[in-house]
Amino acid sequence: MAIWQGRSLRKPSGGRIVLARKKRKRELGREPSNTRVAEQDKRKIIRTYGGNKKVRLTAAAYANVFDKSGKGRKVRIIRVIENPANRQFARRNIITKGAIIETEIGKAKVTSRPGQDGVVNAILLEE
């Protein structure tokens, strides 16, 4: 079923609000992509408002990890250690912005939005 992101059709009292127009396609939302740790990257290109395109990362194997000096490396993601968005996400290996991931070179904090950007960027955490 579609996710509609328009105003509620009910008043606080429970009465109905009669809209002056129909629902618009641009007001539809989508289910979250829930980017998971996998053996290889998997991307999905979707059409957005205005005919633009958005790249969704549905499965991630690699992350671009940057250290304090700004030098970056493409490294393999091992697992999700912690996710402040939802503690169940760490158990399910779902990557979101702010998640702490374990990589080949150490722990890193995700700075990009994989479901919106189509890539996992992270900064290396000091041990």
UniProtKB/Swiss-Prot annotation:
Pfam families linked to this entry: Ribosomal_S8e
Molecular functions (GO terms): structural constituent of ribosome
GO biological process, one term: translation
PROSITE patterns: RIBOSOMAL_S8E
Domain of life: Archaea
Keywords, ordered alphabetically: Ribonucleoprotein, Ribosomal protein
GO cellular component, one term: ribosome
Subunit field text: Part of the 30S ribosomal subunit.
Annotated family: Belongs to the eukaryotic ribosomal protein eS8 family.
Name of the protein: Small ribosomal subunit protein eS8
Gene: rps8e
